[in-house]
Amino acid sequence: RQRQMCIRDSMRTAGILMPITSLPSPYGVGTLGQCARDFIQFLHRAGQTYWQILPICPTGYGDSPYQAFSAFAGQPLLISPDELIKDGLLYGDDLRDYPHFNPDHIYYGDVIPAKLRILHRSYEIFKESADLCMLKEFDVFCEHEKDWLDDYALFMAGKDAHGGACWLEWEDDLRDPDEEIKAVWCERLADSIEYYKYIQFIFFRQWNAIRDYAHVNGIKIVGDIPIFVALDSADVWANRDLFQLEKDGYPTVVAGVPPDYFSATGQLWGNPLYDWDYHKKTHYDWWMRRIKGQLNMVDYIRVDHFRGFEQYYAIP
């Protein structure tokens, strides 16, 4: 029996790369609902073992999963309205005026406001009628994830309060806050902060359900970690010592690559580079937490690009 198990474990396996956003859905973008379960069933019937996805962090204004507002948070656009209805966190009538989208393309400019309207409505229902069990679940989530969630929620609430501007354009006290100043802003933006925590609570609730469904059907999920983070992110705003930045917060150098096989003119990514000496002093704590968080969500991870740990370019 042991020999049979070894043979089975060493057999070749296959999988498919499919971004969750690309799954067919009536909501203009793929979700963590029935369309994800249908795809898992397809993989199971096809004898596949792996579902590889792109990063599922909240995207910035370029809609790229490799330029996210957080390396730890989940993408709100993936939340399924149908699952919200099942949980009593949305009503069917709330979708009556939801736009009809072309199923062949994703028009983020139209999808984002429509989806955010639904999510804000769900938050209102949660505040008005969530039962004690769900409220307790929410509190437990916030406590368990506070290591990144508190800064992320304040960061996003701060962006809303400043018309979506990059944190480098905020007033000095919130751009460079100490703990006392953070407490003042947390009180000032309390409802907006709780909204962003609620959205993450719902995202991870739905994500965990999809991950468990995949496991029941013999499918393992391969996640994706971009090696660099966006300048306009909670990660940089709240952890400036981790990056090569000037005193005013702007990068001293940024990421990119010279001309190569993929690009005749090279690529200027613009991400701030890590201060690896500082990471070493902290025993790479931030990276350890980042990888641990991802492995709590998926079975395997791909780092894009892994070679960046050994060699990278710095562009002034």
Please report, for each region that a protein language model flagged, where it lies by residue.
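Hydrophobic faces of well-ordered beta-strands that scaffold small-molecule active sites
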Residues: 14-18, 51-52, 221-223, 301
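Short, small-residue-biased leader/transition segments that mark boundaries at the very start
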Residues: 2-7
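Alpha-amylase-like alpha-glycosidases and glucanotransferases acting on alpha-linked glucans and related
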Residues: 19, 63-204, 229-316
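Conserved, mostly hydrophobic/aromatic
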Residues: 43, 53, 155, 214, ...
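Short, acidic/polar
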Residues: 31-42, 283-293
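N-terminal regions that are enriched for targeting/export leaders
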Residues: 8-21, 37
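Conserved, well-ordered alpha-helix/loop/beta-strand core segments that scaffold catalytic motifs
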Residues: 196, 200-229
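Catalytic domains of carbohydrate-active enzymes, especially glycoside hydrolases
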Residues: 34-59, 297-298
